[in-house]
UniProtKB/Swiss-Prot annotation:
The species this protein was found in: Methanococcus vannielii (strain ATCC 35089 / DSM 1224 / JCM 13029 / OCM 148 / SB)
Protein name as catalogued: N-acetyl-gamma-glutamyl-phosphate reductase
Active-site residues from the entry: 148
GO terms classed as biological process: L-arginine biosynthetic process
Keyword Cytoplasm: yes
The reaction(s) this protein catalyses: N-acetyl-L-glutamate 5-semialdehyde + phosphate + NADP(+) = N-acetyl-L-glutamyl 5-phosphate + NADPH + H(+)
Annotated gene: argC
Family of this protein: Belongs to the NAGSA dehydrogenase family. Type 1 subfamily.
Length: 342
């Protein structure tokens, strides 16, 4: 039985980690940290996990990284905080899965430009998208868990850019549930403002844009012009991404579907739908990424749609999938559940 610590355990990703790990047979949560809630019972902040595993016995702790002695650490901290924590854990030889954006970029200047933070320096991290980097994840010590929007976007276009059958310009239109904004309420996420409403934000300047771009360029082995615009939906969970690209050659829809099925044939958590329409309820509370659409218009524009749960495949579920790969567990352990539909 391996032991786990969750640093920053009061937010939505920390909550989701606890819920999934409650059904994981190979690990036990030993520490959950929080500065502001130190000393409080875990189940006071997360009542939904009461009576599960050892959670009734746990209290939030205010631990320094040097005092953590578990096999695995999940950093569910805001951007910037991991820069002070991960290097210490890395030096100690502890396996780290970081859910922030702090170690997703090899180009530190790009990180600093988009996140507005001074980086403290590179460490040997691996970008934790299992469908692309599984072999590297197996040997990693620090795994940079992908962002929620990038997960759905990259997976939706990876087969096309890898096979070099679309032009360099790709556009992503994504719509996310409110939980993606985090546990702290804001003017934007306040119920009267988000209910029965839909609107875009950060039209051209969302920090996930370069993350999507760099990963697709890695697959394409060339420069791409990737554009991304997010929207906020009046729902709790889920990201629906509509991807647009232009085909380089005349290719039929059936051939496109075959390319996707071949690319993801060994990927349990990616489901390809030929005719069914993709929706959020199909993936809600699951670690699946559903991909469909594959429609081609008269101008050669192909439209691909993906759906994920932003808190699961877009965050905590993918982090646990990465842990499973890293530790040699069954990759599906704790995650073998379908979407909650309806």
């Amino acid at each position: 039985m391996k032991t786990v610590s969750i640093i920053g355990g009061t937010g939505y990703t920390g909550s989701e980690l606890l819920g999934i790990l409650a059904n994981h047979k190979d690990v036990e949560v030993k520490n959950v940290t929080s500065r502001k809630d130190s000393g409080k019972k875990l189940t006071k902040i997360h009542p939904q996990v009461k009576n599960l595993k050892n959670y009734n016995e746990l209290e939030f702790k205010n631990l320094n990284p040097e005092n953590i002695d578990t096999d695995i650490v999940f950093c569910a901290t805001p951007h910037g905080a991991s820069l002070k924590i991960v290097p210490i854990l890395h030096e100690m030889g502890i396996n780290v899965i970081d859910l922030s954006g702090d170690y997703r970029f090899e180009d530190l200047e790009m990180y600093e430009a988009w996140y507005g933070l001074k980086h403290t320096g590179k460490i040997n991290s691996v970008y934790g998208l299992p469908e692309i980097y599984r072999e590297k994840i197996k040997k990693a010590n620090v795994i940079a868990n992908p962002g929620c929007y990038p997960t759905g976007a990259i997976l939706s276009m990876a087969p096309l850019v890898s096979n070099d059958i679309v032009e360099e310009r790709i556009i992503f239109d994504s719509k996310s549930g409110v939980s993606g904004a985090g546990v702290e309420a804001t003017e934007t996420t306040h119920f009267p403002n988000v209910n029965e409403n839909l609107g875009p934000y950060k039209l051209t300047k969302h920090r996930h844009s370069p993350e999507i771009g760099k990963e697709l360029e890695y697959l394409a082995e060339k420069s791409l012009k990737v554009s991304f615009t997010p929207h906020l939906l009046p729902v709790t969970r889920g990201i629906l991404t509509t991807a647009h690209a232009f085909l380089k050659e005349d290719i039929g829809r059936a051939d496109i579907v075959e390319i996707y099925e071949e690319f993801y044939k060994n990927e349990f958590f990616v489901r390809i739908y030929d005719e069914e329409m993709i929706s959020l309820t199909g993936v809600r509370s699951s670690n699946f990424c559903d991909i469909g659409g594959f429609e081609i218009d008269r101008f050669g524009r192909i439209v691909v749609v993906s759906a994920i749960d932003n808190l699961v495949k877009g965050a905590s579920g993918q982090a646990i999938q990465n842990m499973n790969i890293l530790m040699g567990f069954d990759e599906k352990e704790g995650l073998n559940i379908g979407g909650l539909r309806p």
